[in-house]
């Protein structure tokens, strides 16, 4: 495991203990492991994009929002910026 992966894992473990899942809209159906996995993805995106409130937006609605889906797509290489651009209305 390289240093970056270790730091991301460490940050996600720490964030699980710092963040109450109920605070971001999660119920009892999400396991601590899944919460940590999703949160680690948000941390990775925040580090790549350096947006000030990216982490909060990514965690929004218990990882069910648009930002989380975009983050996962970006990390997997499936993200395309043109997907976020609305098509012009037909004439």
From Swiss-Prot:
Residues 1-18 form the signal peptide. Keywords: Secreted, Signal. Gene3D superfamilies: Crustacean CHH/MIH/GIH neurohormone (1.10.2010.10). InterPro entries: Crust_neurohorm (IPR031098), Crust_neurohorm_sf (IPR035957). It holds the Pfam family Crust_neurohorm. Expressed by the venom gland. GO terms for cellular component: extracellular region. It is found in: Secreted. May increase the toxicity of alpha-latrotoxin and/or other venom components. Is non-toxic to mice and to the cockroach Periplaneta americana. Belongs to the arthropod CHH/MIH/GIH/VIH hormone family. This is Alpha-latrotoxin associated low molecular weight protein SGV150-311. It comes from Steatoda grossa.
